[in-house]
């Protein structure tokens, strides 16, 4: 709050700072007792979802809270999208991702190095303004907290490029894809027949260097190495607590299914608030061993187990340890 007060006191923002005490009263009620029975409609919707392609996000939602999964993916409420009057912090990532996409996209299929990334820096402000205008009302001049949010977005983007400039000093990588669609089909054995279900995803960027592939996903939230570390001794990898791990295992699996040795794939997360940390890779054990063919086989088996649970679920109820979504607090 002190930072906000200091920033807004600047005369150029034309903003008056007024301090008030505020007590928040939560008007929403948590409908934790809501239970929805599975029926022919829900089963057909889940089957269609699996045929068209289920994303790591949907898998994570099912594991974290079946009721939330029902609302978002079975009856299709999804995320509410609208043209916003102000820059909400929750959608900061959308703007940052869009700017990164626009600047890297022209180099898709090309080899780039440190000098190429340096040319991105003068373009940040223009691309950031365009992204904000597209996401928010065009006739609303940014002021106050929105200007601070824009500044945060700018610094996040600058930090990505500064990190890449240093990382690529003296070498080059090929941009294999930007906002790259990934998918893989899995055979699921049912009584007397085999059906295919599809896993799909969208990687922010994929690079390659000397036959090795680097899958990148940018995160506005906090990223910790333990969130993408797995052990052979773990009882299960696909659990409600392993959202980021499931995402990177899924990306690795889908790229592996293109015929790439998993040991030549490094799926990573980049915390935009922790740019000095750099890329945080998916790895096995404390020694940061690479993912193996055996790991992919185990992932596929666990994935099919989750899919079977989706198809056979009898009721959709709130997970007691999950946060309440907006659908449960109305």
Go through each PLM region and give its residues.
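RecB-family 4Fe-4S metal-dependent nuclease core
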Residues: 1-330
